[in-house]
Amino acid sequence: TSFYKSKYISIYDAIKQGAFSRFFDKDAFALYLLKKVYLGADESQLVTLGQICVEAACHDKIAKERPGVPDIRKKAFEAIMDHDFEKMLDTYTGKVKLAYMREALTGRAPADSRVIRPFEQLKRLEQAQKTEELVQAVDWFYNQMVDPTFEKRVGDLEKVLSVSTEELSGFDWQDFLEEEAAEDAYRRMQHQLADAMTSFSA
């Protein structure tokens, strides 16, 4: 768990979890993620994108409320980079996450042309006030960065959001769940995704 990497990661995740619930509708956000996974999106990459977007949207809001948060965030980011640096370099989403953390620590914007546009999108998310803005951002990131064929093959955001609860409840989520769920598997999966959103360590 993140606690064994650094207490600051765990503390920052806990602070952010409370903020995410206060400022945004975490269940609605997780439901969007669930629908996207149902339609074939890569869960791991989608979760990483969700975490980055939630981080971008929450951190300024928390810092204004609690003066000690920027220092905790800095220590958490340093610990994540120490522990997960190589792992983050393995994926495009990991590289964007790394660029975002580096800028937070050093004040330097990324020089890599492949991450400049997503990085700029993330900076804009810092002003986000609505859950819909997070949903739109993650969907844009996924379709641009992870699977540029998704929209053409499966459909746009409207198509994703139109997935019904009947469709979700009829799907076998066991392979995605961290523990067995005899019933209401899709609800458990939704809660699992919601809880994962405020964890920033890889």
Tell me the role of every PLM-derived stretch.
Residues 1-202:
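Short, functionally important secondary-structure microenvironments
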